[in-house]
């Protein structure tokens, strides 16, 4: 039985280190993005939906490509990098509110939402006019949030 106890202790140490790594990563991401508020959660959902609907649209058009898919993922990653940069500008340079971060998040919410609607149209799904209007309005008004 002593061998088993030694293995359990090693495994517990590994688990502890993994927990610390995830806690550190979560802390960094929370700091970098300015916390995970409703806007950021919505952006995550919109980005995932846009990628998924884009893959569906490409499959229907028989245009699936791993290269195009990789570029799409790279663009999605850059969206979140820009949100983080906007948050750093707000918190470290302007030191006043979250106007830049919010404007960047709204900009990409509108872009990703409109892209989902375009993908839905390619798939053959009718798109509600009110939804199109709301996303277009959000895209137009994104910069009005910035009061520097």
Give residue spans per PLM region.
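Short, Lys/Arg-enriched N-terminal segments with co-localized hydrophobic residues
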Residues: 1-10
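Juxtamembrane/interfacial segments flanking transmembrane helices
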Residues: 56, 115-134
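Alpha-helical phosphate/pyrophosphate-handling elements in metalloenzyme active cores
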Residues: 16-34
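Hydrophobic alpha-helical transmembrane segments and immediately flanking/interface helices
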Residues: 92-122
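Conserved small/polar residues in nucleotide/adenosyl-binding loops
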Residues: 146-148
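Helix-coil boundary and interhelical linker segments in multi-pass alpha-helical membrane proteins
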Residues: 29-40, 90-100
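Alpha-helical transmembrane segments of multi-pass membrane proteins
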Residues: 43-54, 79-87, 107-115
